[in-house]
Amino acid sequence: MSNGLPISIGRPCTHDSQRSLSASDSRIHSRFDSLLDTDLPMVHSEGTSAPTQLLRHPNIWFGNIPPPPRRPQDNRDFSPLHPLVFPGHHSQLRHVHETQQVQQTCPGELKLSGIEELPPAPQRQHSLPLHITRPSRFPHHFHARRPDVLPSLPDHGPVLAETKPRTSVRQPRSTTRGPSFRPILLPEVVHVHDDPPHSSLRPGRSRSRQLQPTIRRPLLAPNQFNSPRQPPPLSDDPGILGPCPLAPNSTRDPPPRPITPGPFNTHGVRPLSVLPRAPPRRGLLPNPRRHRTSTGHIPSTTASRPTGPPSRLQRPVHLHQSGPHTPDFRPSGIRKDAFLQTGPRLGHLERLGQSADLRTSERTPSTKRRLPRPSEPNCLPSSLPEATLAPSYRHRRSHPLLPNPPAALPPIAYTSGRGKIHHSLPKGALPKEGPPPPPRRLPSPATPPQSPLRDLGRTPSFPTPPKTSTRAPESCIAAPPTDIAPLDSDPVLSVRTEVHAPERRTFMDPEALRAALAGLPSPPLSVGIIRTASQTVLPTNSPSPTRHLPPTSSPWILQSPVGEDAIVDSEDDSISSFHSHDFNSPSGPLRSQSPSRFRLHLRSPSTSSGIEPWSPASYDYGSAPDTD
């Protein structure tokens, strides 16, 4: 049976609540046969199913499923080791499955219940009336694990439909408002028209359709200024053979067609002129759509060679009669190696009609991309503009103050390893003598006034302060009654001198400047030292912690002998000031105080206090910009 529990091991058994399951087939296993000798009720009194009891029997073993324990704790406790559905790979138990037991009744005992009709309620949206209760649970309906859940309801038969006129379905618009309903319109039925009776019976041929005329658009007035350009007629196409030849007795071209003027225009507008005929195009294939005309009446003439120079190089063609004994004969104008011909064709200079052993003097000089010979002298500029300096913009200057052009600088002595160019001082200007000013304190923020040049003719010096004199007063500088130079506002000792010298203009070629830079020695040799007689005691602690200088290695400094060189200041050229930039110090480069004076900064060669000597006239071309 499809709804019962079919067993394919022996003969099929019937479902009967009064009878028992019996099997007497000889093919059944002895263990299973001894089990089936006993009566197994199909319906359990407590509601459990027959397959469940069959599975719980300790003497039945289905293939690879282990038997359940002998003494289970409860009949309703089903072991999870046994699945509800048996494995399908077993050929004998592939039809065993759980299902509901169908209750069989005698045909005489079947009682048909009366058809329950719904009461005619005026409101159709109400639920079912409350007097229709759910039917009682039947004991024959069971679940896989719990027989009290999901009971099946009996079939009460079809419900009689009410025969009422067709009305629109109404649904409430809102639950809070009154019983106002909005009708829902059903879609109208669209009838498909059948083919007319005189339609074509052949399915492969399409029915003839009536062509509808397109919308007629109004014609625009023709514009005489923008008339379309008409192509030349096909009769004027010369074709591949060129234009038609002239008559044999004619020696000149036929006269062109006269241009016929248009009608007289009274509005002053230039009349339209007939477009000129397009020039004959040579080298074009004839139009295949054009009808060929007979040209038997035209005598054959040879085209004359043009008198002008040819537009491209033409090689003479050598024609030789072919013979049976000359299969490998080639004309002399063609080389045997095809790769050697690619040079002249691609424009190689050595293969354009010139032999390889041709001397250089005999070759045709090339006019384009000619490089100057090394024997030719370099063109030097005849004159350069006078020495000028870039304007000084404080707080906006992004480059050091350098003369423009660089030729206005004094002669170059040497180049230091840090990228500074040191210039030698010009001769002929000696410093002037002046009274020694009183000493000044270092932390004084006021700028000292400009003073004349002090005496520097005795080769003074800056001796290294002794180790025992480092405890001197920090705010004073001791000096003998000799010449004393005033101190700048900078805590580092510096001597500022002002020198006036006659006008001296120096111009130098940039090429010569580069050659001089390359040939200069790196260390200074046989150079004098500028010294002063003042003995100074530098403070141990700097007045400002931000102005402290770390001990660094002293660079090469230009030191010129006194009495031979001096600093030149030109009044006519309005030179602003030369800076000696030292970007290793935290304070940055020194700033100019006088726009029209040279400033000479000197430092003591002492390295015990961490002070780095400066160059008297050094210009750093690669220094960082001044952004203060």
UniProtKB/Swiss-Prot annotation:
Q: Where is the composition biased (Pro residues)?
A: 433-451
Instruction: Write down the superkingdom of origin.
Output: Viruses
Q: Which Pfam families match?
A: Tymo_45kd_70kd (PF03251)
Q: Where are the membrane-spanning stretches?
A: none
Region of interest called Disordered, as start-end residue ranges on this chain: 1-24, 141-492, 537-628
Is Transit peptide found in the keyword set? no
Gene Ontology biological process terms in this record: symbiont-mediated suppression of host innate immune response
**Composition skew (Polar residues), residue ranges:** 166-178, 295-305, 586-596
* UniProt cross-references to InterPro entries, sorted A to Z: 45/70kDa_tymovirus (IPR004935)
Keywords from the named record: Host-virus interaction, Inhibition of host innate immune response by virus, Suppressor of RNA silencing, Viral immunoevasion
The record describes the protein's role as: Acts as a suppressor of RNA-mediated gene silencing, also known as post-transcriptional gene silencing (PTGS), a mechanism of plant viral defense that limits the accumulation of viral RNAs.
Q: Which family does it belong to?
A: Belongs to the tymoviridae protein p69 family.
Which named protein is this?
A: 69 kDa protein
Q: What organism is this sequence from?
A: Turnip yellow mosaic virus (isolate Australia)
